[in-house]
Amino acid sequence: MQPVLELKGISKSFPGVKALSGAALRVYPGKVMALVGENGAGKSTMMKVLTGIYTRDTGTVHYLGKEVIFSGPRSSQEAGIGIIHQELNLIPQLTIAENIFLGREFVNKFGAIDWRKMYQEADRLLKKLNLSYSSHRLVAELSIGDQQMVEIAKVLSFKSKVIIMDEPTDALTDTETESLFRVIYELKSQRCGIVYISHRLREIFEICDDVTVFRDGQFIGEKSVKELKEETLIEMMVGRKLEDQYPRLNLPRGKKRLEVKQISGPGVTNASFSLYSGEILGISGLMGAGRTELMKIIYGALPKTQGQITLDGTPIVIRNPQDGLACGIVYISEDRKRDGLVLGMSIKDNMSLTALRYFSNRLGGLNHKEEQNAVSDFIKLFSIKTPSMGQVIGLLSGGNQQKVAIARGLMTRPKVLILDEPTRGVDVGAKKEIYQLINQFKKEGLSIILVSSEMPEVIGMSDRILVMCEGQISGEFFAEQATQEILMAAAVGKQYGAIQE
């Protein structure tokens, strides 16, 4: 089969950095090509070279059998190569149709906008994607998943032959992800070639036909998904074996640190559990099971309607996150961009934001030297890749942003660290580094709650595992007992005997 798009021998250098060296990518009609690699592997640079944002130093781009040079995103878009970015580019106050045809409105013979034709064409595009809602709806009324469908319709309005999806499920629920996959199958049936950029290996094995792997700006290989195992793909991405991807430490646990008795609140009913010093307690369950809600109740971000929380044997009252921090409970959000980090601020300011009281002098001012020393120590300890602590955090990779978020929590010297989806959107190499940091905290006696949708991660890192279903704890297991089948059964409400304390 001839590729609809082929990039060969692509090289691109910036001052002091070789971003791409002999990189290659082929996209076939009616097939999904995954493009994978660690953060910094060159995936984004390759897409910018393809669409003309960057000029390539060497190499060729062939599209529909002809060599092409695009002058920028508009020329590649008009040629039929569309990109759906991780950050959606829609105007909430406009309708779906207005967003799809913004700057390309249909005009009648009198020079006025032909609204009827525009809405008819927008409705036709939505129908092509098997979407039932009207193009008269405002984008602001749509979920993130539906907004992404509008982006796909917008790309199709250019009669795109190739569609590039950059981390398309990053902000989607499980249901929205299923809807996206249905649309991808529909696009395949229409002979569209799709480039699927993702860190989520499970999705790659579910939706993609072939995989292209980049490492350090170089093309490592192209394989059929059917020929690959997950371990082999990870080895190709990181250049080393990852047999010890989950380096769990088997250490004796300490004294009881936290006890939660009959807690209820938004999305949670009668939850009870204990947590010990030097222990990692995994929390598993399906989307909407109440895992995040339970953690936010404990931390004070959601109201508790009944129950008691005891810390080191003393009952505590937590009305808000400030109370939680004061008691020594830190919550690292699953959505670091919305709840965790201020992307326009520096690494230093983000890291020390909740711990400024530790750097204040007797006059109430800040001891900047102490603050800088502490931030510098954490940057070294966490191996955060940055030119300086003054770097704007929004420019860091997802893995390095997550390390800063965790470091900020540790700066407050907590007793309990709650990590909600700590490796979401993080590449496999950075995941391993985060696991090693979690083990270091465990060695030091910190009590850790690890909330994760990735069952291998929960089983691989936890000492004990709680499973939630419909707001209740439906199972409790030692890690040695746990399998993905057992956890899934508990997650859908099938009863397994909980372990005894």
Curated annotation (Swiss-Prot):
* Compartments where found: Cell inner membrane
Q: Name one GO molecular function term.
A: ABC-type D-ribose transporter activity
Gene Ontology CC, one term: plasma membrane
Keyword Translocase: yes or no?
yes
Which positions are annotated as binding ATP?
A: G37, E38, N39, G40, A41, G42, K43, S44
Which residues belong to any copy of the ABC transporter domain?
Answer: 5-241, 249-495
Q: Which UniProt keywords apply?
A: ATP-binding, Cell inner membrane, Cell membrane, Membrane, Nucleotide-binding, Repeat, Sugar transport, Translocase, Transport
The highest taxon in the source lineage is: Bacteria
Pfam families the record matches: ABC_tran
Keyword Repeat listed? The answer is: yes
> What CDD domains does its record include?
ABC_Carb_Monos_I (cd03216), ABC_Carb_Monos_II (cd03215)
Q: How does it sit in the membrane?
A: Peripheral membrane protein
Reactions this protein catalyses: D-ribose(out) + ATP + H2O = D-ribose(in) + ADP + phosphate + H(+)
The EC number(s) given in the record are: 7.5.2.7
- Enumerate the PANTHER family for this protein: CARBOHYDRATE TRANSPORT ATP-BINDING PROTEIN MG119-RELATED (PTHR43790), D-ALLOSE IMPORT ATP-BINDING PROTEIN ALSA-RELATED (PTHR43790:SF3)
Q: Which family does it belong to?
A: Belongs to the ABC transporter superfamily. Ribose importer (TC 3.A.1.2.1) family.
The record's listing under NCBIfam families reads: PRK10762.1
Q: How does it assemble?
A: The complex is composed of an ATP-binding protein (RbsA), two transmembrane proteins (RbsC) and a solute-binding protein (RbsB).
The role this protein plays is: Part of the ABC transporter complex RbsABC involved in ribose import. Responsible for energy coupling to the transport system.
Name of the protein in its database record = Ribose import ATP-binding protein RbsA
